[in-house]
A protein has these predicted regions:
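Divalent metal-dependent phosphate-bond-processing catalytic cores, especially two-metal-ion Mg2+/Mn2+ enzymes
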Residues: 20-28, 32-44, 57, 68, ...
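Acidic/histidine metal-binding catalytic segments
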Residues: 42-53, 92-111, 122-129
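Short alpha-helical hairpin
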Residues: 1-13, 54-60
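An active-site-proximal "capping" alpha-helix that borders the catalytic cofactor pocket
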Residues: 29-37, 76-91
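Glycine- and acidic
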Residues: 14-18
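His-Asp-centered metal-binding catalytic motifs of divalent-metal-dependent phosphohydrolases/nucleases
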Residues: 48-74, 78-82, 86, 103-115
């Protein structure tokens, strides 16, 4: 599984590019997190293996996205594109995706980055798990650096304020300021599905680390306390 993924990345993309390297390591971490959560939930061994594979492949669309556009989240929906790639026979063979697992893989990859799951998949355990694992690693990455926004103001947009107080994740297009970005990070916690993911988040202390890196901490204290 990992060997095929490494060959795919190293043979098709420039690993010297920091963005490619970052997505490669993110994919491996999410795979490890996915396995850890599935094991904690006492899933059958085959389901643990599938969750691990989905974690590894969830961002496969990111590599082409960066190579083509040199940016993320502007011109391509990488979840939808990743599912499109994995639906191809050559990718199915490359990553040894079992025919009876294929729809689970496609659904999990397609919907991992959407604002919410459709009603038909709201109880799908693989879709729920990959969204948890991905968010946990995104929060980890954000805890390791300062938040940077072109609009560096401590002003919360009306739409972001409304979504945050409803207890929902924040729509990306609504994020316009530094303050919006901070709340959008915190709101990721609202969409975590499994108690064990929340336990990991607490044990790793990521939210407090993000708070420690903030500008104008007092402005955000009540929002962090709410989480």
């Amino acid at each position: 599984m990992y060997r095929e993924f490494e060959e795919f990345v190293f043979n098709n993309y420039d690993f010297n590019e920091p963005a490619i390297k970052r997505k490669y390591y993110h994919s491996k971490r999410v795979s490890t997190i996915s396995k850890k959560i599935a094991e904690n939930l006492a899933w059958p061994l085959e389901d643990i293996k599938l969750a691990t594979q989905i974690g590894l492949l969830h961002d496969i669309g990111r590599f082409d996205e960066w190579t083509m556009y040199k940016c993320f989240n502007k011109y391509m929906d990488h979840g939808s594109y990743g599912a499109y790639l994995l639906n191809k026979e050559e990718y199915e063979k490359m990553f040894n995706i079992k025919s009876y697992d294929k729809q689970e893989v496609l659904d999990a990859v397609y919907y991992h980055n959407k604002l919410k799951l459709p009603a038909s998949l709201k109880d799908n355990k693989f879709c729920k798990l990959i969204r948890d694992a991905d968010k946990l690693d995104i929060i980890y990455q954000l805890s390791q650096r300062e938040i940077v926004m072109e609009n560096n103001t401590h002003v919360i947009s009306k739409e972001v304020f409304k979504e945050f107080n409803k207890g929902t994740t924040i729509t990306n297009k609504h994020v316009k300021t530094y303050a919006d970005k901070v709340l959008s990070i915190l709101a990721l916690v609202y969409d975590i599905n499994y108690d064990y993911t929340l336990e990991l988040l607490k044990n790793f202390n990521y939210i407090n680390k993000i708070y420690d890196n903030l500008e104008n901490k007092e402005f955000y204290k009540d929002y962090f306390d709410k989480i």
